[in-house]
Amino acid sequence: MQNNRPLIAHLCLFFACAFWGLMAPLGKDAMTHGITGIDMVTFRVTGGAILFWLTSLFTPKEHVPRKDLLMLIGAAIFGLVTNQCCYTIGLSITSPINASIVTTSMPIFAMILAAIILKEPITGKKALGVVFGCTGAVILIVTSAAAASSKVGDIRGDLLCLGAQLSFALYLSLFSKLIKRYSVITVNKWMFTYATILILPFTFNHVAGINFAAVPTSTWLETGFVVFFGTYISYILMMVGQHTLRPTVVSIYNYVQPLVSVTVSVLTGIGVFKPTQGLAVILVCLGVWLVTKSKSRADIMREQNAKQQQA
């Protein structure tokens, strides 16, 4: 079982990002038929908190010291509140294509921050993997965009989306050790609880003003998918991956999201597959493989110790 941990971690990250890729079109449709971005963020955070607390009733209890509870507030701020609020508000200001392109910056931030905070080396293979993945993701986004977009990008929205990526990259680097210390359910339970406490005072009146009877059933089903699969299940899967893999490896799976979005659009007949998209898929897969195969700090230290022992 121990030998299968890396494989399980990679599969969990793939499916988490696949759900996020599916969440994008469903969430966007919901936010144009009865609810707003602020409502969606509130539903995700509060819904996640309720689901994780219910799940915790059926899992072993874990004692979390006060110091770590305070640290989890920081994790909630960077991993949930700032990330989700900045991206959702940014998306409402700028164009979807601009927002999608900006999200490709997250693995770059994660690689740089992991080098500064965790002292993870930026190897040639790792840097090349991030470049390949970023290039492939941008090609996917640009080639799948509509020829004529009714919405023009806005620098304010772009900067907010950029801030969301930086926030999540900081979360991956700053709280990597804390996340590994406790179970996935315990960490998420407290993170979503703190996020709810921080967000709800500012969004409650907005959500209370929804005309619930006028919201279509399809919108509630889409919102349900976003809350359950795009939030609850995805955060469980992502943290399983975090328990085993390095922050840069976790972040590189961000490039799977546009891949899934384009695949779904082609399968449903909304989009048309193009040869350039085939190249983009190859680049994304190659990028993920290169980053996964790059040497970690521990690998390099082991090699150095082995050389010293041989000398």
Task: Label each residue range with its predicted role.
Residues 47-51, 102-116, 131, 194-199, ...:
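Alpha-helical transmembrane segments of compact multi-pass small-molecule transporters, enriched
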Residues 30, 40, 44, 90, ...:
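Hydrophobic/aromatic residues within transmembrane alpha-helices
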Residues 5-10, 34-38, 42, 64-70, ...:
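Juxtamembrane helix-entry segments on the extracytoplasmic side of multipass membrane proteins
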Residues 32-82, 109, 167-174, 189-208, ...:
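Transmembrane alpha-helices of multi-pass small-molecule transport proteins
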Residues 19, 23-24, 53-103, 139, ...:
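Specific transmembrane alpha-helical segments of multi-pass solute transporters/efflux pumps
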Residues 52, 73, 113, 125-144, ...:
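Hydrophobic transmembrane alpha-helices of multi-pass small-molecule transport proteins
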Residues 11, 42-43, 84, 98-105, ...:
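Helix-helix packing/entry segments at the starts of transmembrane helices
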Residues 1-43, 150-177, 197, 201, ...:
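Glycine-/small-residue-enriched transmembrane alpha-helix faces in small-molecule transporters
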